[in-house]
Amino acid sequence: MPPESEEVLSRYPGSDKGSRTLETYTLRESAAATSADLWKGHSDTIAQGRMGVFLVTVAVLICYVAVPGARTLFGAIALLLSMAFVALIVRHARARRFERWHRELARVARSAQDRRLRRWEALERPSPPSPVDHPYAEDLDIFGRASLHTLLSSTCTQPGEELLTSWLLGPAAPDVIDQRQEAVRELTPAIEFRDELEATGRIAGPVEPEQLRLLLEWAESPAWVLPRTRLRYLAVAVPLSLVATIALHVFAIIPYLWGISIVLALAVMRCSTERIQEDFARASTGESGLRLYHTLIERVAEKQFQTTLLKGVRDGLTPGGEAAAEALGRLFRFIEMSDLRHNGNAHVPVNVATLWDVHVLVRMERWKEEHGQSLRGWMTSLGHVDALSALAGLAHAHPRWAFPELQRK
């Protein structure tokens, strides 16, 4: 262990246990960095192979053009090389993904060392200033550069950050405190789970609060198209009439009747497009933030917990019926379908022919009726695990620090 590490640890009680904790972080960082370097070497090898296959493919295509008598042979070789090139692209992406994953795990372990050794300047995320006129935040150094909040700066989600801040600034009922302590004790030795959760959040990146606010507003707002039965019927009837009138025209029964169907479709679009686009915009703006949390929610839902609070949080993500991660996956697919509006060449003809936007919004609003009121709870559940993991990280780094025992009168 470096001398400066021993000097810092010697200031704290239980330094033997602290040194073992620090050694754990050091070993985890070294193992993750080694794995990342191995995957980087693998990635570089694949990249060189891709370049080689590409150059050989170009040479084969030149031969295909230059030697007409052997085009069948060179065409077959070019096809095989193209398939190999695609396979290498997939493998390269996988290698880079694993490299980044292990690199983030190494950074997580390094950050844990920095917090344990009080290397404040090395910590990446600044702590917010203390709230004005708060009764104890400034006196107890809850926020600021060298503060309790900085020691707990391993949260990886906006809901987790907000929840942890509220816990630091406000009291809790004794029963709630007992449940939190029980959950923290369960998570303290679960270093693999905590590190993987933080690494996943780092890869996802920060989510702007405004993004989540827009999506939550959309999810909790009343449906617009579902109550409009006439509009939904028209969205089915008008495209069917277009198919029927085109058939009448093709078979020379009644020509040009399809023009009426197109006029009807344009009329429906004129009456509904502005409102539909507004809903699409709100949902898709927030979706980009929520998509980053999808993997985190999936990881938490897969974990088996034992304590009351954590089991309740997990149950909130896996209610009877469709699990939160699966439901979010469906929502993402619907929002991707709504993105057709960004393709100017395809959107107008497809929308005129099928009233595509109405059908997509119907699916999104049915999802909203089923899960919209649960979305905020899913974010809160994720925030609970994130905040409790940060507290567990502090408990793991300082094994001799006490858990207060509350006595009820």
Model-derived segments and their meaning:
Residues 2-409:
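Alpha-helical bundle segments enriched in helix-capping/polar residues
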